[in-house]
């Protein structure tokens, strides 16, 4: 279509020229004493056009001639710029391939090319960012080579370059350097330095998933359990882990926080710092109760912490595994001396509803021992002793049966029970 239009235009121009020049009788007379030259108007116009064309070509030729030095300089700068980018890409490729010495050399070559360009007064739009990335790649390679002196030198230069904020430099460049510095501090087992690097980040950058992961590792490494727990909660909200992994991580940190309490007041303060979902975790509640028992605190409060776990076990017997059921029984057994009537009713009701559960038989039997219900205690503990799997509970069962036999002055049964208890290894 375009060619057809060009042909039509060409035909139109040819027709116009033919109409204008075909019957044109005009002449142009040039007086140059003593000469006189008569030229037709058509020839005059043709000569003018030819002169204009020659002048235009001559000017273009002169312009091209005088621009040769500038074009040669631009060509040299382009070659150096290409070499710079090639060296930077080579450094990244060598780093990813695990060739750290070559990666560092390539990064240093990129820095040398950038300095050469700067010496030629070449202004690259991304010069500052290229310098920062080159230093960062060199520092990363030095870290892999265990050359901490070179790593720190390149890191400091990268920080200095990124601190000079220009219009064309993005803040993410400096944030990336700070995150890598925090990671290297973690690799050096220097958690305070890693946390200090993370604190230098802007507020928005501190809440990114990568920064939170680094903060979590640094806090755990530095034994800052509260900070680690808060960070783990944020990561769970950001879905940085799977639900199971997040729950396991939070559960472990909550348990560690409770373990750090050295008196009942500290334990209660740590318990209050936990969220409701964390308090409902069986492992956390049982561990809190065990710590309260170990610290000789309020056993009624410990039983109150265990109540949701107990109700869950009664309503859904399979919701707790055998290990948690044993821990729950141990925690409740430790407070049987001060247990109230409500808890005794709960224990008795749960044992009646599930008469084959050896753990419940043991707990109910020990409760009967504390209440001096010898006959019922003898019956429950005898059945429990035949089915218990936990070595400690099994051993305590036979010890209790031996004490009951001694109370009845039955020396033979007491001796047999003590013998069975001695045969069981303490955990």
Protein language model features and the residues they cover:
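Transmembrane alpha-helices and immediately adjacent membrane-cytoplasm interface residues
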Residues: 44-75
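Membrane-proximal, non-transmembrane interface segments of integral membrane proteins
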Residues: 74-182, 188-193
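Residues that mark the junctions of alpha-helical repeat units in TPR/alpha-solenoid scaffolds
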Residues: 83, 124, 131, 174, ...
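Structural register within alpha-helical repeat arrays
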Residues: 90, 131, 138, 181, ...
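Residue at a conserved register position within TPR or TPR-like alpha-solenoid repeats
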Residues: 94, 135, 142-143, 185, ...
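Structural motif corresponding to the intra-repeat A-B loop/turn of tetratricopeptide repeats
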Residues: 97, 145-146, 188, 222, ...
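Alpha-helical repeat scaffolds
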Residues: 108, 149-161, 190-202, 225-238, ...
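Alpha-helical adaptor scaffolds
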Residues: 146, 174-183, 317-390
């Amino acid at each position: 279509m375009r060619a057809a239009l060009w042909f039509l235009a060409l035909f139109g121009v040819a027709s116009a020229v033919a109409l204008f020049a075909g019957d044109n009788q005009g002449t142009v007379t040039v007086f140059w004493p003593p000469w006189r030259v008569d030229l037709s108007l058509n020839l005059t116009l043709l000569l003018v056009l030819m002169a204009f064309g020659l002048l235009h070509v001559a000017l273009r030729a002169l312009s091209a001639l005088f621009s040769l030095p500038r074009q040669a300089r631009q060509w040299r700068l382009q070659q150096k710029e290409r070499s710079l980018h090639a060296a930077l890409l080579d450094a990244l490729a060598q780093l990813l391939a695990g060739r750290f010495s070559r990666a560092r050399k390539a990064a240093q070559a990129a820095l040398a090319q950038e300095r050469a360009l700067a010496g030629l007064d070449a202004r690259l739009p991304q010069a500052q960012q290229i310098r920062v990335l080159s230093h960062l790649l060199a520092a990363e390679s030095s870290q892999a080579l265990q050359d901490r002196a070179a790593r720190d030198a390149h890191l400091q230069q990268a920080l200095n370059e990124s601190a000079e904020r220009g219009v064309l430099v993005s803040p993410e460049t400096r944030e990336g350097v700070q995150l890598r510095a925090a990671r290297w501090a973690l690799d050096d087992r220097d958690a305070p330095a890693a946390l200090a690097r993370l604190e230098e980040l802007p507020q928005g950058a501190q809440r990114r998933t990568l920064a939170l992961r680094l903060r979590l590792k640094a806090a755990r490494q530095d034994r800052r359990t509260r900070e680690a727990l808060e960070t783990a909660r944020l990561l769970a909200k950001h879905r940085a882990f799977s639900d199971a992994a997040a729950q396991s991580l939070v559960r472990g940190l909550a348990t560690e926080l409770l373990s750090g309490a050295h008196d009942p007041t500290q334990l209660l303060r740590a318990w209050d710092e936990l969220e409701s979902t964390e308090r409902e975790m069986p492992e956390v509640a049982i561990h809190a109760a065990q710590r309260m028992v170990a610290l000789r605190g309020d056993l009624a409060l410990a039983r109150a912490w265990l109540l949701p776990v107990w109700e869950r076990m009664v309503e859904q017997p399979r919701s707790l595994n055998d290990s948690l059921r044993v821990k729950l029984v141990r925690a409740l057994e430790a407070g049987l001396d001060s247990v109230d009537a409500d808890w005794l009713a709960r224990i008795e009701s749960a044992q009646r509803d599930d008469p084959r559960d050896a753990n419940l038989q043991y707990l109910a039997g020990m409760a009967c021992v504390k209440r001096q219900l010898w006959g019922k205690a003898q019956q429950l503990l005898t059945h429990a002793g035949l089915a218990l799997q936990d070595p400690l509970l099994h051993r305590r069962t036979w010890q209790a049966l031996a004490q009951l036999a001694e109370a009845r002055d039955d020396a033979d049964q007491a001796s047999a029970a003590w013998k069975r208890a001695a045969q069981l290894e303490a955990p």
